[in-house]
């Protein structure tokens, strides 16, 4: 079947929309007509060469409508509205204990370029194209394993929902599934991008007393207030650690670091109170710590969190319900782009002009 896809042909090059071939879905797979796809930092990192092998079709925050189902797929049917999330095997020790985000085959299934049976689905002129996160949603159609797919209600605009598959799931899930803060506790969120602002909305739902957001962009800090932040700090103008400790009388109970910037990670750790806990979400470099002084003597906990410790089939419907109730207005983070403008969408995300770009691919 011929489809149009945004092709990543080599490192650090713009995506090119061209016609390619997609195979029919196999027994455990479905064919989805893509309506829209969010653009995530991980897509941008892959263009730099830090992801799946080239040539590839990227995109891992897809939403669309099922057009065909494999013979082993019983919980999905033609016409279902779906969100596509990360790929997992559902049979390893991590998956069987509910930790699908820590699947033992995570790297292979999401970044290896092949689907679960270790074959390709995308081709052009006799050359195989890598699949990304088991979906490759920067295309008019995608073939994905049934475990990638989350069925959603028909009464919410599909164009909104793709980003729930990664960035928004990561931010909200880190609060709700990983840190699980108590009502009345405090949290500092470093970085007011899509992940950080999703964490703000989740913290607000859970009834935290102090929700402190740190960023360098005033417009994003203003949006953070609108979404539920009780305090915002511009780290270009303030000693963040001192300010957080003033606000909370000694430090926050919890923190989330979304930027990956080493100095910001250190600030996040230092802003914790005794026995505080920080979740590291952003991809970054080395951080120098004195574990005796920074961690041991104050009983602090550092945890790495992937995909918000979320099982997509459980977490995404919950977030959609909060959206319907007006408690999680994630649509305020989104800006829509035509599929042909996908490279501009990447640029606007890089410069900070857009928090969460979404490319409209179909209808």
Residue ranges: model-predicted function:
Residues 189-192, 197, 201-267:
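Adenosine-nucleotide cofactor-binding segment
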Residues 277-279, 290-332:
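Rossmann-fold dehydrogenase core element
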Residues 22, 93-190:
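NAD(P)H dinucleotide-binding glycine-rich loop of Rossmann-like/cofactor-binding domains
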Residues 81, 186, 276-277, 301:
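Short glycine-centered segments of the SAM/dcSAM-binding site in methyltransferase folds
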Residues 1, 238, 262, 266-270, ...:
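C-terminal hydrophobic helical "lid"/dimerization subdomain
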